[in-house]
């Protein structure tokens, strides 16, 4: 009996040591895994950041992956032009050439088959080129803040010949500029500076935000994306709420949430290139009536940054790390993410008591 008990005790001790080794290994693994949560409203550039991580840290897009984006890019180009043509009537803008009215009818007749096949036929290409070139359509495009139009519209519509070619293969820039609404939760893993990063992107639409809570566990850092150029735009969801006001409200709720007391908070003030272009035409006061500064990129960008940072109610203990970004610019994102990683590592070491 005593011998059998001794054997059982030895086995229990071996089992205990195996568990201890596993726990130590798991603890070390967790310390080397960084969970990044991408948050922000719709159209803030979160999914583009994920694509950039694939380009910078995961080998990019091979030929087959590039080809897979062709139907989406075709859809983006067609959808942009149909939105412009539909907006003509609402904005009471006429075609410069009356013949374009027939082209508009043809556009809507031909787009269904084109989108289902993922290709632009020569007939549809001619229709799209004539419509896009019409001064009336261009005037409507110039008033795109009065209806919903994606940022990539001009990029694709100015290059229809290339996109419509039968042998068209999307470039990396084409892919970065493509727009597909994120639904659900998208995870992307990569290694950088001997750390494993798990970047989690969740949809920014109001209907998607109820899913965010499922991603909060074990978050090392939050990257909150802001659409700088959205200061004059309304939400898709209700066409009334200011996109910037919605972003500020959302940031307030994340920044001051007790769940994230020990979580690094990084603010990506994104689409700086579009803000620089837009601020020359549309004053910042349309969103912030109290703004008295110059309508220059430098002053407007800093003012918007301050609006977000001032929402932090725990300035003594929580720091916000802000960066101005252009999500479609790989070199910019590479530089910023390198700096962000250093901050995350430092804060993580501090949190676990090693710094």
Curated annotation (Swiss-Prot):
Chain's role: Guanine nucleotide-binding proteins (G proteins) are involved as modulators or transducers in various transmembrane signaling systems.
InterPro entries, alphabetized: Gprotein_alpha_I (IPR001408), Gprotein_alpha_su (IPR001019), GproteinA_insert (IPR011025), P-loop_NTPase (IPR027417)
Stretch list, region Disordered: 1-26
Binding site for GTP: 40-47, 176-182, 201-205, 270-273, 327
GO cellular component, one term: synapse
Pfam families: G-alpha
G1 motif: region residues: 35-48
Region called G3 motif, residue ranges: 197-206
Protein name in the entry: Guanine nucleotide-binding protein G(z) subunit alpha
Membrane topology field: Lipid-anchor
Region entry G5 motif, spans: 325-330
Family as reported in the entry's similarity comment: Belongs to the G-alpha family. G(i/o/t/z) subfamily.
Domain G-alpha: 32-355
Lipid-linked residues (N-myristoyl glycine): 2
Biased composition (Basic and acidic residues): 1-14
């Amino acid at each position: 009996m005593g011998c059998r008990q001794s054997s059982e005790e030895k086995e229990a001790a071996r089992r205990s040591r195996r568990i201890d080794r596993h726990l130590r290994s798991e603890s070390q693994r967790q310390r080397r895994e960084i969970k990044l949560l991408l948050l922000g409203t719709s159209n803030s550039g979160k999914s583009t950041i994920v694509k950039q991580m694939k380009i910078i840290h995961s080998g990019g897009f091979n030929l087959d992956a590039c080809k897979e984006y062709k139907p989406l890019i075709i859809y983006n180009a067609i959808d942009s032009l149909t939105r412009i043509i539909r907006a003509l009537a609402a904005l009471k803008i006429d075609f410069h050439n009356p013949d374009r009215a027939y082209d508009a009818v043809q556009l809507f007749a031909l787009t269904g088959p084109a989108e289902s096949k993922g290709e632009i036929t020569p007939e549809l290409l001619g229709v799209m080129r004539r419509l896009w070139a019409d001064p009336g359509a261009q005037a409507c495009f110039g008033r795109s803040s009065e209806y919903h139009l994606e940022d990539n519209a001009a990029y694709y519509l100015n290059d229809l010949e290339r996109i419509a070619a039968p042998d068209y293969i999307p470039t990396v820039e084409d892919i970065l500029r493509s727009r597909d609404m994120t639904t659900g939760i998208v995870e992307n893993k990569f290694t950088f500076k001997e750390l494993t990063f798990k970047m989690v992107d969740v949809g920014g639409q109001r209907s998607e935000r109820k899913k965010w809570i499922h991603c909060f566990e074990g978050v090392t850092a939050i990257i909150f994306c802001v659409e700088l150029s959205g200061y004059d735009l309304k939400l898709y969801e209700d066409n009334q709420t200011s996109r910037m006001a919605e972003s500020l409200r959302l940031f307030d709720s994340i920044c001051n949430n007790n769940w994230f007391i020990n979580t690094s908070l990084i603010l990506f003030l994104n689409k700086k290139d579009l803000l620089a272009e837009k601020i020359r035409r549309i004053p910042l006061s349309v969103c912030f009536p109290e703004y008295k500064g110059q309508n220059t990129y430098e002053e407007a960008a800093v003012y918007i940054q301050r609006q977000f940072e001032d929402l932090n109610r725990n300035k003594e203990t929580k720091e916000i790390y802000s960066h101005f970004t252009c999500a479609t610019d790989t070199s910019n994102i590479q530089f910023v993410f390198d700096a962000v990683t250093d901050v995350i590592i430092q804060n993580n070491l501090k949190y676990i008591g090693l710094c």
